[in-house]
Amino acid sequence: MAEVSLTKKEMTTKGKSENSKKMKTDMADMVPIAAMNEDLLHNILLRLPAKSFAFASCVNRFWSSVCNRILSRPKMISAFSRNPDQLRAGEEVLDKVLSEPIRPQFVIANITCGNMEETLTLITERVGSRVPIIVSVVTGILGKEACNDKAGEVRLHSTSDDELFDVANFAILLTIGYLPGMKVDIIPVIQAKGESGAEMEDKFVMDIRNYMSMVSGHAAAPACLILFAEDTHATEPVLHKLDYAMPAETVIVGGQIGEFLHKRGNEPRNVQLQKDDIRVLAGLIFARDRHRPAQAERIQFDTAISNGMSSVDLRYKAANVNVSLGPSCPSTLLTAKRRGEAEVLDGDQILDDIDNILENYIWENDSYLGVIKRRKYSIGLEEKPKIMSSLVFHQVNGSDDQDLLVDGAGIKTGDQFQVYLPDLKVAEAALNDVSAQLRNLKSKPNKPEVVGGFAFVGSCRGDSFFGCPNADSSPFLENFPELPFGGIFCDGEIGRSLILEEGEEKKEVSIQRFLHVYSSVYLIVSYTS
């Protein structure tokens, strides 16, 4: 905090009259400081970086009230750096996002490589130990560069035909937010040794409900959850249980496959895992503060999704299903029947079906099974199970005259599926739809101001997919060119959507689509004054 010094005339003091005269002169000199015009003070404080602003808010009640008015509106700022030095890159993005008044409520750091613990420590030193922080390793980042505010992308690129990836330089994206009226913290999912998947899933849901009860009141739902998950077979069931448990108004976005560290708001540093514990995911939870309802209701979270896949118009039912437990991730061997037919097809026959329709197109692209999983869900033992249908993607890894081989597990005999392929035209049309959604947001009667944006983009998209840079950033750039947005390239994009499918009895069936591939999931944070 800058010190304010007053110029005093050099004078010789003699007697009480001289002292009294000097006191009156000093008090007269101090009046302009104490009674500084509020608008002038507002303009001065508005230009301070975050640290100086924090000191200024402690000067006196008047300054504090002006600071509070400056921060009466929410802020969400992202910036990235390509600096190959991890420490300097971290300092660059921290300097950028803290270059204006803000009281950090949460920080998200995404790095392409390097040491997550170092980044977590650096951020904690700059923003304080009471701020929840998530650090994750991702396959790429996008947003605006800290040094020039220009939009750009940093991605992993294939270095050989065996699809090994390499990043020559470190890059970091930092996102910091202040949302008055909201409480923000991190709810982690750690699977303890011997803990069943069902116990872990239920505990996560109950931890969320308990936090909401404490912050927002009984039966309240989170406004938003941002999820970062590890590459573990335990992740998918947790996410489906969460999708089932959270009401439709809760916005949920994230990345399913990656690495992360986290620090909760009440923890001074990252908590080390116990031996044999497994880090599954961390959820950044946004809850409306029941003590500040007016402010909380002015903040809205919205999502938009750009899908990049199209289905082949052939429907199958899984016949024989066998799971193979690999060293890191399980895989599934299956045969299938065409819907309405009795003949069991092996893996080669299934792909020959697709090959005949698409004229060898399948072998030029990634192919996926889009499996409709109709399952019963409940929370704990007291709740009656309910059925939810979800569309889940499994990448095709090969076939022979016996089986079709796909990634992952959880497919059951009788599950219906179609083959899905990346489709550039679908992706481009979907991006235009997302951009139109954002335009419509601007034209709402209450005229919300978009204050933040974040994108979770499939790692196979980007310039190599679209043939041009910044395509996945275009909805933000076209509609909000000044917005300091950010985003990551990841695997397993998380975003809630509902689709209607025609069932076997010609009835429409609602199907949840929560986990995506070849898509972009956009989070938009807006504020209504």
From Swiss-Prot:
Domain F-box: 31-78
Region feature (Disordered): 1-22
LRR repeat coordinates: 265-288, 418-441
Keywords: Leucine-rich repeat, Repeat
InterPro entries: F-box-like_dom_sf (IPR036047), F-box_dom (IPR001810), FIST_C (IPR019494)
SUPFAM superfamilies: F-box domain
Protein name, as recorded: F-box/LRR-repeat protein At5g63520
Source organism of the structure: Arabidopsis thaliana
